[in-house]
């Protein structure tokens, strides 16, 4: 009996990555700082972030950072029209992707790029393949995001510091 249950369980937990996830998996390995912003055009919290102009300013003031706006739970639509409205889509350090997953139902994605996804907007900061910061539950505060970007430029080494022993 156990033999029959195990294959069904394993098959039910496996999933294929979307093209957006595959592209992002390669991008976050970059030695440069990379921001992944998971959002959807229908989401009022995501819209509120755009209306403040914070994303536009953040992108313009950090040309060395690569920003990925990934529309999720939006039936494959990438939200480019809305990002264009706020001057984000045409920026040279911005890539726009759309995950094909639906907004509702059993096929709604619950993880993206190997991390849990239960709320949008969510903003993740990577450097050299390492997740440096994850803001998972709501609108980002742009001064905080800027501090995280600044901190992510460091090597995070404690060499030469005195031991606490």
Model-derived features with residue positions:
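Short active-site neighborhood of thiol/selenol oxidoreductases, capturing the structured segment around
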Residues: 28-47
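Structural microenvironment flanking redox-active thiols in thiol-disulfide oxidoreductases
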Residues: 48-88, 102-108
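A short beta-strand-turn-helix
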Residues: 17-34, 57
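Non-globular targeting/processing and membrane-anchoring segments
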Residues: 17, 148-165
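Sec-dependent N-terminal signal peptides
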Residues: 2-13
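Solvent-exposed loop/turn segments at secondary-structure junctions
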Residues: 40-45, 72-77, 100-103, 131, ...
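Thiol/disulfide oxidoreductase modules built on the thioredoxin-like
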Residues: 101-147
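Loop/turn elements at helix/coil->beta-strand transitions in domains of secreted/extracellular proteins
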Residues: 30-35, 63-68, 90-93, 120, ...
